[in-house]
């Protein structure tokens, strides 16, 4: 089925023929739904809710860890284009009317003075039309304002990445999300006066990000007395996936070549694997707030970091005991209790295993990457949720699931997903080294059966696209996972331009 030209194309992308065959098989078979035990909650022990005393202890733990000079990295997926933020404004440009009609359009134009980009927008409008934004509104020339915001003749926001848009107003100058993440790194992810920030970006925007960092980094280093090491990576072509026709034959471009598409954020497990660090914080590019509201974010990030360090210490100590061979059955039982109670990983019949089998089981389960994930109370926002799920080896563990991973024909599962008490704001702290200080090879811990297939089109032709297991979903399926309740104030994503008018972004 694959031609000589196909094989050359595959090789040039760094993809093996076996991987392409595997992807075609996944298209044919589809992906199994996950088997759920329950939505994770505080009541069933799936989500931690630390007491004030415990919080203080974990915060102190994190500050001690920072003082030890460990390498902490802030990892920010930032390849997302801003075009979706402006979907309603693009629709307004194409609308048969010239003045704002919808509630969204009216809210935008009524509040143009509130946006952090207002001065740049006004400057662009004046340079081209000799009229300010206010003048253009009074003259009913609303679409010209939008063109200057979104188009190349103006700010070009319709084609820029989210990370480079002006989000927040300050007395000296407005800030982009990129800058807010640099500040966050200095506030909770620094060690010995140095902080590391890694952005994953698209190839087309890489230079723009580098230019912005070069322009701004010194300002924030001085303001926070912290040396900022900023690095970038792109999604690897070798993680692209083959698109197929509805009949599962390879979809071909007009020139006859195979169509490969980016495999979604799950591909970033390869980028994360390349990061050199002891602990990695992960948060999306658009979930930032101005300085006056950063307090909750900083405190809760430190809290998650402290919980991670606390759990790592105990895990590493147990693994060292197993290496010495002088352990007792009582110690093994204590490790099982820790694994089940603290790391929420359970399997029936473990107590019946003999010592050798139990040690093998404990080694396998304890010696894994660990992540501590913040979870916020469910207020109906779209996104994944925390669940207790059954794994192929018979264990039950914590997973972050998307709706696409749940059988929509199973009423009990759908109810559990809809009625879950918490949801995933993408707020993770990850331990990516083992108890001997070696980096884990993260692709070894991916569940390749947790991707999904979506329907897309190209040039008017339908196709099936293969999404890799999501970064915080199947790509981290075989990690030790702990969920911790964090306040809703730490979750402030910007999905539309009008979200910037919310109090938390003003």
Residue ranges and their predicted role:
Residues 182-186, 410-413, 468:
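Short amphipathic beta-strand starts and helix->beta connectors
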């Amino acid at each position: 089925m694959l031609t000589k030209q196909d094989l050359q194309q595959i090789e040039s992308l760094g993809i093996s023929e076996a991987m392409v065959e595997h992807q075609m098989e996944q298209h044919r078979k589809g992906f199994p739904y996950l088997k759920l035990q329950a939505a994770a909650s505080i009541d069933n022990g799936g989500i931690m809710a630390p007491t004030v005393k415990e919080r203080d202890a974990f915060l102190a733990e994190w500050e001690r860890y920072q003082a030890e000079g460990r390498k902490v990295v802030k990892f920010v997926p930032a390849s997302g284009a801003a075009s979706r933020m402006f979907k309603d404004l693009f629709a307004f440009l194409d609308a048969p009317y010239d003045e704002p009609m919808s509630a969204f359009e009216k809210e935008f134009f009524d509040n143009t003075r509130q946006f952090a980009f207002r001065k740049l927008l006004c400057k662009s409008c004046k340079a081209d039309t000799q009229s300010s934004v206010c003048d253009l509104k009074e003259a009913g020339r609303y679409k010209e304002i939008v063109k200057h915001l979104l188009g190349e003749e103006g700010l070009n926001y319709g084609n820029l990445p989210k990370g480079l848009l002006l989000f927040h107003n300050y007395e000296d100058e407005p800030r982009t999300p990129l800058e807010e993440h640099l500040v966050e790194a200095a506030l909770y992810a620094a060690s010995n006066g140095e902080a590391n920030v890694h952005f994953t970006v698209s190839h087309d925007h890489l230079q723009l990000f580098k230019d912005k960092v070069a322009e701004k980094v010194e300002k924030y280093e001085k303001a926070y007395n912290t040396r900022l090491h900023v690095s970038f990576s792109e999604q690897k072509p070798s993680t692209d996936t083959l698109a197929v026709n509805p009949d599962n034959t390879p979809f071909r471009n007009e020139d006859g070549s195979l169509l490969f598409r980016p495999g979604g954020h799950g591909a970033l497990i390869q980028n994360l694997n390349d990061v050199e660090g002891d602990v990695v914080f992960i948060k999306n590019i658009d979930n930032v707030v101005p300085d006056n509201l950063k307090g909750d974010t900083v405190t809760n990030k430190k809290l998650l970091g402290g919980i991670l360090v606390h759990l790592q210490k105990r895990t590493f100590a147990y693994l060292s005991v197993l290496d010495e061979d002088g352990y007792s059955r009582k110690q093994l039982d204590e490790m099982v209790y820790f694994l089940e109670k603290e790391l929420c990983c359970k399997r029936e019949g473990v107590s019946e295993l003999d010592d050798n089998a139990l040690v093998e089981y404990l080694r396998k389960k304890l010696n894994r990457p660990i992540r501590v994930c913040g979870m916020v109370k469910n207020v109906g926002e779209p996104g994944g949720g925390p669940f207790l799920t059954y794994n192929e080896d018979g264990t039950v563990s914590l997973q972050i699931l998307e709706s696409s991973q749940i059988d929509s024909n199973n009423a009990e599962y759908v109810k559990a997903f809809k009625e879950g008490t918490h949801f995933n704001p993408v707020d993770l702290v990850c331990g990516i080294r083992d108890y001997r200080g070696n980096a884990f090879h993260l692709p070894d811990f991916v569940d390749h059966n947790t991707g999904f297939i979506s329907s897309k089109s190209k040039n008017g032709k339908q196709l099936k696209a293969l999404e890799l297991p999501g970064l915080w979903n199947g790509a981290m399926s075989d990690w030790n996972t702990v969920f911790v309740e964090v306040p809703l104030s730490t979750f402030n994503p910007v999905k539309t331009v009008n979200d910037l008018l919310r109090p938390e972004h003003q």
